[in-house]
Amino acid sequence: MFAVIKAGGKQYKVDRNSVIKVEKIDGELGSKIQFDQILMIGEYSKPSFIGTPIVKGAIVTAEITNQLKDNKIIAFKKKRRKNYRRKAGHRQELTELKILDITKQ
């Protein structure tokens, strides 16, 4: 069974026991969270349920396995011949989740 969830403004296709990285979700390691914004749910051998915009009664349960930071992204601006240079770095904070269960009531 698979589902398409919405987390942090992005969409992720998840299966049971899959591990995904989403934008930071506050919580302690090992704590369980539930996603109720499920956009699509289905099985590979049967037709899928597509939400309008979400599937009612569908819940995805996940466990927080890690809190980490992504690689640094450099933003650099320059104007030629004017000695104007600006450099900024950014590291996005991420949460690693393990999908435990996908249910539809």
From Swiss-Prot:
Domain of life: Bacteria
Keyword entries, A-Z: Ribonucleoprotein, Ribosomal protein, RNA-binding, rRNA-binding
Keyword Ribosomal protein part of the UniProt annotation: yes
Any GO molecular function: structural constituent of ribosome
GO cellular component: cytoplasm; ribonucleoprotein complex; ribosome
Gene Ontology biological-process annotations: translation
Job of this protein: This protein binds to 23S rRNA in the presence of protein L20.
Classification via HAMAP family: Ribosomal_bL21
Record's subunit section: Part of the 50S ribosomal subunit. Contacts protein L20.
Family: Belongs to the bacterial ribosomal protein bL21 family.
Protein name (Swiss-Prot/TrEMBL): Large ribosomal subunit protein bL21
Organism: Rickettsia prowazekii (strain Madrid E)
Gene: rplU
